[in-house]
Regions:
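Early exported N-terminus immediately downstream of N-terminal targeting peptides
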Residues: 1-44
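Extracytoplasmic
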Residues: 2, 22-24, 62-64, 78-79
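A short, solvent-exposed beta-edge/loop patch
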Residues: 70-103
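Short Gly/Thr-rich strand-loop-strand
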Residues: 46-74
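Terminal interaction module
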Residues: 3-6, 40, 68, 82, ...
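Short, low-complexity, Pro/Ser/Thr/Gly-rich segments in the mature regions of secreted, periplasmic
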Residues: 102-112
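Surface-exposed flexible segments
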Residues: 37-51, 95-98, 106-107
Length: 113
């Protein structure tokens, strides 16, 4: 199946008060454990990453898991965006974080999620 979760910035501030120095507009999480569905959207996802000019920050490959963190630079009308993909044998998670933060802030946030 597919599970979608949206967390707005106000809830994040309430849940993580020690992260008040960063400005997160929202976090969107898509959890996919349907291989057919994932294969059908993979090409579209790769094209979106290319079109939106995401840059890879980190990529790790473990024996059973791949993690990739990409960043889209902010423009005058849009804040920064991060896309985190976590792929394992069982499922894949796509996590979009929209807001202004440094790499160190992102690492701190990910440890809390």
């Amino acid at each position: 199946g597919v599970t979608y979760v949206n967390i707005n910035g106000e809830i994040i501030k309430t849940l993580l008060p020690d992260m008040s120095n960063i400005s997160i507009k929202e976090i969107n999480i898509l959890d996919i454990d349907n291989r057919q569905f994932l294969q059908s959207i993979d090409k579209d996802l790769q094209q979106c990453i290319k079109d939106e000019k995401y840059k890879q920050l980190i990529k790790t490959v473990d024996s059973d898991e791949k993690v990739c963190i990409l960043k889209k630079e902010k423009s005058s009308d849009c804040p920064s965006a991060f896309l985190i993909t976590v792929q394992s044998k069982e499922d894949t998670q796509l996590i979009w974080i929209t807001g202004d933060m440094r790499k160190e802030d992102l690492e701190k946030l990910l440890k809390k999620l």
